Amino acid sequence: MTQQIRQQPSPVTNSNLYPRLRKHFVMLLTYAILTIIAALFVIPFMWLVITSLKPLNQVFTDPPRWIPDPILWQNYVEALTSPAFPFLRLLRNTLFYAGVSTVGIVLSSALVAYGFARLEFSGRDVLFGITLATMMLPGIVTLIPTYVLFRWFGWVGTYAPLMVPHFLGGAFNIFLLRQFMLTIPWELSDAARVDGAGELIIFWRIMLPLIKPALLVVAVFHFMFAWNDFLGPLIYLDEATEYPLVLGLYAFQTRFGIQWHLLMAATLSVTFPLIVLFFVAQRYFIEGVTLSGLKG
């Protein structure tokens, strides 16, 4: 006869229960705080979408209407075909200078970062420290001298001030790419040098393919900055035919008064490409930001 031995469950004591309850409480509190913070960011965007679908007489109703009645998709057609907001021309201008400046800052920052990360020369660390120190200087401080310089060059009224400076790199982008390059094994560069490759060949054929996630981070950061830049185009561009999308929105709301439902539709149309860009590049974006901080 076989004897069955039952294993009695150990009683749950207060000493075991308290840490579990505390862990669940902390987790619940964390999610509650994160939900509130997320709502602070999501609700304005939701209001933007809702307002873009309302008729004008429902924009400022009290209490506010969260569901438009009727839903007017026609607002987008009116906004994007309005003479005050020539969307296709504004989009073309924005893509031109934002795209060119993005290519310039990615290549120049990567080249400078390669020098700081992979080359040994006298004063390298001092120069890198000076480069980082430039991030401490607010851009508004240099606004007037920069404008005077660009006017002396004859660049005011052209896209040059919005593109050419970015071909000289940027301190934050250089730092980000340098940190990523420090994670690349030195053996790859040494093997290429043994085979007779020069530094430019190593940079172009070995280093750039290996740092694609970080390059994408720099490209996305700068493209979003250039897309949303308001002050630069406002200062340096004179003709309305050269305006980007953000200045088009500004002219849209001041030329015929503020028609909020159409302005919100135009604003969402301007914002939507950046949202799509971020979600498409999200995986590489997070990878680049994470790996760039592995080694200092």
Model region roles, listed by residue range:
Residues 1-21:
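Short, Lys/Arg-rich, polar N-terminal cytosolic tail immediately upstream
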Residues 8, 18, 27-296:
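A structural signal for multi-pass alpha-helical bundles of membrane permease subunits
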